[in-house]
């Protein structure tokens, strides 16, 4: 499920906005997605749920027509991510929808502190909140500083009968230093107190709290706070996966924070799942970069439970050390040769079924489905050579006996590395990325040693 960015127009100027690279301004012109292109994207992303985003999606001149098209599809559901300052046309349209249609639209109202609105904007927001079925609405807000007064969120939920709240931790636009409002080393702990207090207060009022973007790492909380928070459903999350934003021209990016470094185009992919997997694989390379010194030896990082905070902070941390750092060596032959491959034995299994047969397969996230990979001698030799200490270029030299010449060795070994990477079985160590060696069971280690 992707976010369809139907417009880059927005009628607010939020202090924590991370969409500044695409938002229309004096240098970037308005881009309202044409209806024909909107329909094409719906074919590319044919999920049962479609997310409409911006900018502010309701500023699109064809917004209501887009809703009508989606509602005409049997079984289609819609999420609208909005600031709620709707025009009278949009408000009347939504208020007038029959229940059979309105129940298929969910609204996430991202709201600011009351003193950040003009009187007109505030009246529009309250009118929008009053126009929707509270059961289909979330109130969302972003914590971008501390101390942070969230009492207005609880009051707004009470006033409009909305029971579900989503919170985010502000994430910077990596090219806009004005958005660097949070320093992980200094601010994560204080922000964790804000999150904890908010969740406890909301829970006491019977509200459902859902985490959104910008998760904090477990180490930001005290053990006592974590114990309390783990009892609150749906609970905390310490990592994220690609949702994928798709805009005009088929331009797609993993998320707004990573807009400038992780982009693609829908024309190069078979569908939304293919595109999402492309981004998710490369996400792991960013997650391997340490934000804090403590991350290097962290068991939560080892297990994949925690990324250490928003991935944009990983990028910033790397650029502070090397402005020319290559984040995705898997896509660059020269960088790949210099990297150190690490196998992920939570995903990859090497099973010596018998003295004459070794089976190599992958199974992700405790799924029932497996995929069998190659088990020829050179592939098994490559797996054994990936010891987390040896660079790719040295592995190629060590496996030279299997090939006719160095060019063939280089091409084949890099192809094997990319095969394992595409199956979520390979991490790449670099000067700034330190994927930890996964713990192996005795049987797995024994199988690895006998290769």
Label each residue range with its predicted role:
Residues 327-355:
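Hydrophobic packing positions characteristic
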Residues 17, 285-334:
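Cysteine-cluster motifs in flexible loop/terminal segments that predominantly coordinate metals
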Residues 1-33, 44-45:
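Canonical Radical SAM [4Fe-4S] cluster-binding loop centered on the CxxxCxxC motif
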Residues 35-53, 60-188:
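Radical SAM/AdoMet-radical enzyme domain recognition
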Residues 190-225, 251-307:
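C-terminal accessory region of radical SAM enzymes
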Residues 352-380:
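Short alpha-helical segments that sit at the start of domains
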Residues 297, 370-451:
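Long, charge-rich, low-complexity alpha-helical segments
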Residues 233-241:
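Short, small/polar residue-rich loop motifs at catalytic or cofactor-binding pockets
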């Amino acid at each position: 499920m992707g976010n369809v960015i139907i417009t880059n127009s927005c009628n607010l100027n939020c202090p924590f906005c991370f969409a500044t690279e695409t938002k229309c301004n004096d240098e970037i012109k308005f881009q309202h997605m044409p209806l024909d292109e909107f329909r094409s994207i719906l074919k590319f992303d044919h999920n049962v749920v479609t997310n409409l985003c911006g900018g502010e999606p309701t500023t699109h001149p064809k917004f209501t027509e887009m809703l009508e098209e989606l509602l005409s599809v049997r079984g289609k559901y819609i999420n609208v991510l909005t600031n709620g300052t709707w025009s009278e046309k949009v408000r009347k349209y939504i208020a007038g929808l029959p229940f059979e249609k309105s129940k298929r639209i969910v609204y996430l109202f991202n709201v600011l502190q009351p003193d950040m609105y003009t009187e007109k904007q505030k009246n529009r927001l309250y009118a929008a909140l009053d126009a929707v079925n509270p059961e289909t609405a979330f109130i969302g807000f972003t914590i971008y500083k501390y101390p942070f007064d969230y009492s207005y969120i609880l009051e707004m939920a009470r006033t409009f009968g909305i029971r579900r709240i989503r919170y985010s931790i502000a994430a910077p636009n990596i090219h806009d230093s004005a958005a660097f409002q949070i320093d992980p080393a200094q601010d994560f702990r204080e922000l964790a107190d804000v999150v904890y207090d908010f969740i406890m207060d909301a829970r006491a009022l019977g509200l459902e709290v859902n985490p959104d973007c910008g998760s904090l790492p477990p180490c930001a909380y005290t053990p006592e706070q974590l114990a309390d928070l783990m009892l609150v459903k749906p609970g905390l999350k310490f990592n994220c996966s690609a949702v994928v934003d798709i805009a005009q021209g088929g331009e797609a990016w993993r998320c707004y924070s990573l807009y400038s470094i992780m982009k693609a185009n829908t024309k190069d992919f078979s569908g939304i799942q293919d595109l999402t997997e492309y981004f998710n694989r490369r996400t792991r390379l960013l997650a391997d970069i340490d934000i804090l010194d403590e991350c290097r030896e962290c068991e939560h990082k080892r297990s994949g439970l925690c990324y250490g905070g928003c991935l944009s902070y990983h990028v910033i941390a790397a650029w502070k050390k090397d402005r020319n750092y290559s984040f995705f060596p898997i896509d660059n032959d020269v960088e790949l040769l210099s990297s150190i491959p690490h196998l992920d034995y939570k995903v990859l299994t090497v099973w010596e079924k018998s003295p004459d047969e070794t089976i190599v397969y992958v199974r992700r996230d405790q799924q029932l489905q497996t995929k069998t990979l190659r088990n020829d001698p050179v592939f098994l030799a490559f797996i054994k050579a990936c010891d987390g200490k040896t660079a790719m270029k040295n592995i190629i030299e060590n496996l030279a006996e299997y090939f006719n010449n160095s060019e063939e060795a280089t091409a084949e070994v890099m192809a094997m590395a990319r095969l394992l990477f595409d199956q979520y079985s390979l991490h790449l160590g670099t000067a700034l990325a330190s994927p930890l060696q996964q713990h192996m069971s005795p049987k797995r280690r024994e199988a690895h040693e006998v290769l």
